[in-house]
Protein backbone atom coordinates (compact mmCIF):
# COMPACT_ATOMS: atom_id res chain seq x y z
CA UNK A 1 0.00 0.00 0.00
CA UNK A 2 2.79 2.43 0.94
CA UNK A 3 4.71 1.74 -2.27
CA UNK A 4 1.54 2.27 -4.30
CA UNK A 5 1.12 5.65 -2.59
CA UNK A 6 4.66 6.65 -3.55
CA UNK A 7 4.05 5.59 -7.15
CA UNK A 8 0.93 7.76 -7.18
CA UNK A 9 2.92 10.66 -5.75
CA UNK A 10 5.45 10.33 -8.57
CA UNK A 11 2.65 10.64 -11.10
CA UNK A 12 0.59 13.44 -9.55
CA UNK A 13 2.89 15.70 -7.49
CA UNK A 14 4.83 18.37 -9.33
CA UNK A 15 6.35 21.00 -7.02
CA UNK A 16 8.62 21.00 -4.00
CA UNK A 17 5.66 22.26 -1.98
CA UNK A 18 3.65 19.20 -3.05
CA UNK A 19 6.42 16.80 -2.18
CA UNK A 20 7.15 18.50 1.14
CA UNK A 21 3.52 18.12 2.21
CA UNK A 22 3.51 14.49 1.06
CA UNK A 23 6.72 13.73 2.94
CA UNK A 24 5.49 15.29 6.18
CA UNK A 25 2.30 13.25 5.97
CA UNK A 26 4.22 10.03 5.35
CA UNK A 27 6.70 10.72 8.15
CA UNK A 28 3.92 11.41 10.64
CA UNK A 29 2.02 8.35 9.48
CA UNK A 30 5.14 6.19 9.92
CA UNK A 31 5.70 7.43 13.48
CA UNK A 32 9.32 8.31 12.82
CA UNK A 33 11.71 9.26 15.60
CA UNK A 34 13.50 12.59 15.17
CA UNK A 35 16.66 13.01 17.18
CA UNK A 36 19.59 12.85 14.81
CA UNK A 37 19.62 16.43 13.59
CA UNK A 38 16.03 17.67 13.37
CA UNK A 39 13.16 17.29 15.82
CA UNK A 40 10.06 17.26 13.61
CA UNK A 41 8.70 15.86 10.36
CA UNK A 42 8.63 19.18 8.48
CA UNK A 43 12.27 20.08 9.08
CA UNK A 44 13.41 16.53 8.34
CA UNK A 45 11.50 16.47 5.06
CA UNK A 46 12.75 19.91 4.05
CA UNK A 47 16.35 18.92 4.76
CA UNK A 48 16.12 15.71 2.73
CA UNK A 49 14.47 17.46 -0.21
CA UNK A 50 16.92 20.37 -0.31
CA UNK A 51 19.96 18.15 0.12
CA UNK A 52 18.86 15.72 -2.58
CA UNK A 53 18.25 18.57 -5.02
CA UNK A 54 21.58 20.25 -4.18
CA UNK A 55 19.81 23.39 -2.97
CA UNK A 56 20.92 25.65 -0.08
CA UNK A 57 19.75 24.08 3.16
CA UNK A 58 18.61 27.43 4.58
CA UNK A 59 16.59 28.57 1.55
CA UNK A 60 13.40 26.53 1.25
CA UNK A 61 10.88 29.32 0.61
CA UNK A 62 12.16 30.56 -2.79
CA UNK A 63 11.93 27.06 -4.23
CA UNK A 64 8.60 25.84 -2.84
CA UNK A 65 6.71 26.33 -6.09
CA UNK A 66 9.49 25.10 -8.36
CA UNK A 67 8.51 22.17 -10.54
CA UNK A 68 10.78 19.17 -10.58
CA UNK A 69 12.05 17.15 -13.49
CA UNK A 70 10.86 13.56 -13.49
CA UNK A 71 14.36 12.34 -12.64
CA UNK A 72 14.60 14.80 -9.73
CA UNK A 73 11.19 13.79 -8.43
CA UNK A 74 12.11 10.12 -8.61
CA UNK A 75 15.31 10.70 -6.66
CA UNK A 76 13.64 12.79 -3.95
CA UNK A 77 10.74 10.38 -3.48
CA UNK A 78 13.14 7.44 -3.23
CA UNK A 79 14.92 9.12 -0.32
CA UNK A 80 11.64 10.01 1.39
CA UNK A 81 10.38 6.46 0.98
CA UNK A 82 13.51 4.99 2.56
CA UNK A 83 13.22 7.37 5.51
CA UNK A 84 9.53 6.54 6.01
CA UNK A 85 9.61 2.80 5.40
CA UNK A 86 13.03 1.74 6.68
CA UNK A 87 13.35 4.36 9.46
CA UNK A 88 16.90 5.13 8.34
CA UNK A 89 18.15 8.34 9.99
CA UNK A 90 18.43 11.23 7.57
CA UNK A 91 22.17 11.58 8.15
CA UNK A 92 22.76 8.08 6.83
CA UNK A 93 20.71 8.85 3.73
CA UNK A 94 22.63 12.04 2.97
CA UNK A 95 25.97 10.92 4.48
CA UNK A 96 26.15 14.29 6.18
CA UNK A 97 25.83 15.36 9.81
CA UNK A 98 26.23 18.79 11.32
CA UNK A 99 27.64 19.90 14.67
CA UNK A 100 27.51 23.64 15.00
CA UNK A 101 29.27 25.10 11.97
CA UNK A 102 31.04 21.84 11.14
CA UNK A 103 29.70 19.14 8.84
CA UNK A 104 30.97 15.58 8.71
CA UNK A 105 30.72 12.53 6.50
CA UNK A 106 28.83 9.71 8.25
CA UNK A 107 27.55 6.27 7.41
CA UNK A 108 26.35 3.28 9.41
CA UNK A 109 29.86 2.50 10.63
CA UNK A 110 29.60 5.35 13.16
CA UNK A 111 26.95 6.88 15.37
CA UNK A 112 25.56 10.17 14.16
CA UNK A 113 27.32 13.09 15.94
CA UNK A 114 25.15 14.57 18.67
CA UNK A 115 27.47 15.09 21.63
CA UNK A 116 27.11 18.26 23.66
CA UNK A 117 30.86 18.37 24.26
CA UNK A 118 31.52 20.42 21.15
CA UNK A 119 29.61 23.33 22.75
CA UNK A 120 32.12 23.45 25.61
CA UNK A 121 35.40 23.50 23.73
CA UNK A 122 37.24 26.80 23.94
CA UNK A 123 35.39 29.38 26.04
CA UNK A 124 33.25 26.73 27.75
CA UNK A 125 36.27 25.27 29.55
CA UNK A 126 37.43 28.46 31.20
CA UNK A 127 38.72 28.87 33.90
CA UNK A 128 40.05 25.28 33.88
CA UNK A 129 41.85 25.95 30.59
CA UNK A 130 42.47 29.68 30.75
CA UNK A 131 44.02 30.04 27.30
CA UNK A 132 43.48 27.82 24.27
CA UNK A 133 47.23 27.92 23.61
CA UNK A 134 47.83 25.97 26.84
CA UNK A 135 46.52 22.80 25.18
CA UNK A 136 49.47 21.14 23.45
CA UNK A 137 48.30 17.54 23.50
CA UNK A 138 44.69 16.33 23.55
CA UNK A 139 42.94 12.97 23.42
CA UNK A 140 39.53 12.04 22.05
CA UNK A 141 38.42 8.65 23.38
CA UNK A 142 35.75 6.80 21.36
CA UNK A 143 36.23 9.22 18.49
CA UNK A 144 33.71 7.63 16.10
CA UNK A 145 33.44 9.95 13.10
CA UNK A 146 36.28 12.10 14.46
CA UNK A 147 33.97 15.07 14.94
CA UNK A 148 35.20 16.08 18.40
CA UNK A 149 38.87 15.60 17.51
CA UNK A 150 38.43 17.86 14.49
CA UNK A 151 36.70 20.53 16.55
CA UNK A 152 39.43 20.33 19.19
CA UNK A 153 41.96 20.98 16.44
CA UNK A 154 39.97 24.09 15.53
CA UNK A 155 39.70 25.45 19.07
CA UNK A 156 43.23 24.54 20.15
CA UNK A 157 45.48 25.56 17.24
CA UNK A 158 48.71 24.50 18.96
CA UNK A 159 47.48 21.02 19.90
CA UNK A 160 48.39 17.61 18.55
CA UNK A 161 45.42 15.30 18.97
CA UNK A 162 45.14 11.55 19.37
CA UNK A 163 41.76 10.14 18.34
CA UNK A 164 41.08 6.63 19.62
CA UNK A 165 38.45 4.05 18.77
CA UNK A 166 38.11 0.29 19.22
CA UNK A 167 36.31 0.05 15.87
CA UNK A 168 38.41 -0.04 12.71
CA UNK A 169 35.26 0.77 10.74
CA UNK A 170 34.78 3.95 12.75
CA UNK A 171 38.39 4.97 12.24
CA UNK A 172 37.97 4.63 8.49
CA UNK A 173 35.14 7.17 8.65
CA UNK A 174 37.16 9.41 10.96
CA UNK A 175 39.97 9.26 8.42
CA UNK A 176 37.66 10.58 5.72
CA UNK A 177 36.72 13.55 7.89
CA UNK A 178 40.26 14.27 9.04
CA UNK A 179 41.37 14.33 5.41
CA UNK A 180 38.42 16.52 4.41
CA UNK A 181 39.54 19.11 6.96
CA UNK A 182 43.22 18.79 6.03
CA UNK A 183 44.23 17.77 9.55
CA UNK A 184 46.30 14.66 8.82
CA UNK A 185 49.39 16.29 10.37
CA UNK A 186 47.63 17.19 13.61
CA UNK A 187 45.22 14.33 14.31
CA UNK A 188 46.56 10.82 14.82
CA UNK A 189 43.99 8.02 14.53
CA UNK A 190 44.69 5.09 16.87
CA UNK A 191 43.02 1.69 16.93
CA UNK A 192 42.78 0.65 20.57
CA UNK A 193 40.33 0.19 23.43
CA UNK A 194 40.26 3.41 25.45
CA UNK A 195 43.71 3.95 27.02
CA UNK A 196 45.19 0.56 26.15
CA UNK A 197 48.67 0.94 24.68
CA UNK A 198 48.73 4.74 24.85
CA UNK A 199 52.01 6.24 26.02
CA UNK A 200 51.56 10.00 25.98
CA UNK A 201 50.03 12.41 28.47
CA UNK A 202 47.52 15.10 27.68
CA UNK A 203 46.33 18.53 28.73
CA UNK A 204 42.75 17.69 27.73
CA UNK A 205 40.93 14.37 27.39
CA UNK A 206 37.38 14.30 26.05
CA UNK A 207 35.07 11.36 25.55
CA UNK A 208 31.55 10.67 24.42
CA UNK A 209 31.66 6.95 25.25
CA UNK A 210 28.86 4.40 25.01
CA UNK A 211 26.52 5.10 27.93
CA UNK A 212 23.13 3.49 27.26
CA UNK A 213 22.12 0.95 29.91
CA UNK A 214 21.03 -2.55 28.90
CA UNK A 215 17.33 -1.98 29.55
CA UNK A 216 17.25 1.23 27.53
CA UNK A 217 19.09 -0.38 24.60
CA UNK A 218 16.14 -2.75 24.22
CA UNK A 219 13.72 0.20 24.09
CA UNK A 220 15.55 2.44 21.61
CA UNK A 221 13.55 3.71 18.61
CA UNK A 222 14.06 1.85 15.35
CA UNK A 223 16.28 4.64 14.00
CA UNK A 224 18.96 3.81 16.58
CA UNK A 225 19.12 0.20 15.38
CA UNK A 226 20.89 1.47 12.27
CA UNK A 227 23.75 2.74 14.45
CA UNK A 228 26.56 0.43 15.62
CA UNK A 229 25.49 -1.16 18.90
CA UNK A 230 29.11 -1.07 20.06
CA UNK A 231 28.84 2.72 20.24
CA UNK A 232 25.62 2.75 22.28
CA UNK A 233 25.38 0.13 25.02
CA UNK A 234 27.75 0.02 27.99
CA UNK A 235 26.68 -2.67 30.42
CA UNK A 236 23.79 -3.06 32.81
CA UNK A 237 23.87 0.53 34.11
CA UNK A 238 25.48 2.22 31.10
CA UNK A 239 28.68 3.05 32.97
CA UNK A 240 31.12 0.29 31.97
CA UNK A 241 33.16 2.53 29.66
CA UNK A 242 32.96 5.52 32.01
CA UNK A 243 34.31 3.42 34.89
CA UNK A 244 37.37 2.51 32.83
CA UNK A 245 37.89 6.15 31.92
CA UNK A 246 37.69 7.28 35.55
CA UNK A 247 40.02 4.48 36.63
CA UNK A 248 42.76 5.35 34.17
CA UNK A 249 42.44 9.00 33.13
CA UNK A 250 44.68 10.52 35.82
CA UNK A 251 47.68 8.52 34.55
CA UNK A 252 47.28 10.13 31.14
CA UNK A 253 46.65 13.72 32.24
CA UNK A 254 49.32 16.34 32.72
CA UNK A 255 49.26 18.43 35.92
CA UNK A 256 46.12 20.61 35.85
CA UNK A 257 44.89 18.50 32.94
CA UNK A 258 41.15 18.29 32.31
CA UNK A 259 38.86 15.31 31.70
CA UNK A 260 35.53 15.99 29.96
CA UNK A 261 33.01 13.14 29.58
CA UNK A 262 29.42 12.91 28.39
CA UNK A 263 27.22 10.30 30.08
CA UNK A 264 23.67 10.86 28.86
CA UNK A 265 21.04 10.56 31.59
CA UNK A 266 23.31 8.72 34.04
CA UNK A 267 24.21 11.58 36.38
CA UNK A 268 22.42 10.19 39.45
CA UNK A 269 23.80 6.69 38.93
CA UNK A 270 27.33 8.02 38.44
CA UNK A 271 27.28 10.28 41.49
CA UNK A 272 25.96 7.42 43.62
CA UNK A 273 28.77 5.18 42.37
CA UNK A 274 31.50 7.79 42.97
CA UNK A 275 30.45 9.91 45.97
CA UNK A 276 34.08 10.89 46.59
CA UNK A 277 34.57 12.58 43.22
CA UNK A 278 33.75 16.32 42.99
CA UNK A 279 32.11 16.27 39.57
CA UNK A 280 31.53 19.64 37.91
CA UNK A 281 28.47 19.47 35.64
CA UNK A 282 28.69 21.90 32.76
CA UNK A 283 25.76 23.71 31.20
CA UNK A 284 24.95 22.71 27.62
CA UNK A 285 21.97 23.20 25.33
CA UNK A 286 20.62 19.93 26.74
CA UNK A 287 20.89 21.02 30.37
CA UNK A 288 23.49 20.69 33.12
CA UNK A 289 23.39 16.95 33.74
CA UNK A 290 25.01 15.45 30.66
CA UNK A 291 28.71 16.40 30.69
CA UNK A 292 31.05 16.34 33.67
CA UNK A 293 34.50 17.79 34.20
CA UNK A 294 37.23 16.58 36.52
CA UNK A 295 40.84 17.70 36.81
CA UNK A 296 43.78 15.34 37.23
CA UNK A 297 44.17 16.54 40.80
CA UNK A 298 40.50 15.83 41.59
CA UNK A 299 40.81 12.33 40.15
CA UNK A 300 43.81 11.72 42.40
CA UNK A 301 42.04 13.16 45.47
CA UNK A 302 44.55 16.01 45.74
CA UNK A 303 41.98 18.81 45.72
UniProtKB/Swiss-Prot annotation:
Disulphide-bonded residues: none
Example GO biological process: methylation
One annotated GO molecular function: nucleic acid binding
SUPFAM superfamilies referenced in this protein's UniProt entry, alphabetically: S-adenosyl-L-methionine-dependent methyltransferases (SSF53335)
EC number of this enzyme: 2.1.1.298
GO CC annotations, alphabetized: cytosol
One Pfam family cited in the UniProt record for this chain: MTS
Catalytic activity: L-glutaminyl-[ribosomal protein uL3] + S-adenosyl-L-methionine = N(5)-methyl-L-glutaminyl-[ribosomal protein uL3] + S-adenosyl-L-homocysteine + H(+)
Alphabetical UniProt keywords: Methyltransferase, S-adenosyl-L-methionine, Transferase
CDD domains reported for this sequence: AdoMet_MTases (cd02440)
Gene3D superfamilies, sorted: DNA helicase RuvA subunit, C-terminal domain (1.10.8.10), Vaccinia Virus protein VP39 (3.40.50.150)
Role noted for this protein: Methylates large ribosomal subunit protein uL3 on a specific glutamine residue.
Entry's family note: Belongs to the protein N5-glutamine methyltransferase family. PrmB subfamily.
Name of the protein this chain belongs to: Ribosomal protein uL3 glutamine methyltransferase
Amino acid sequence: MVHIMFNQAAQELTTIRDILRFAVSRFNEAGLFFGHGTDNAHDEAAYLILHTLNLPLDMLAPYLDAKLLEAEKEEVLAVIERRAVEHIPAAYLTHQAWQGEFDFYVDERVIIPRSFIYELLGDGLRPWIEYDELVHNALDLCTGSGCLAIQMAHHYPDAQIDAVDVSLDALEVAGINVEDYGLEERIRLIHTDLFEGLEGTYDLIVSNPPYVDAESVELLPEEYLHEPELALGSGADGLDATRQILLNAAKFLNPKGVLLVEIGHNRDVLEAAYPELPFTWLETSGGDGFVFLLTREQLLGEE
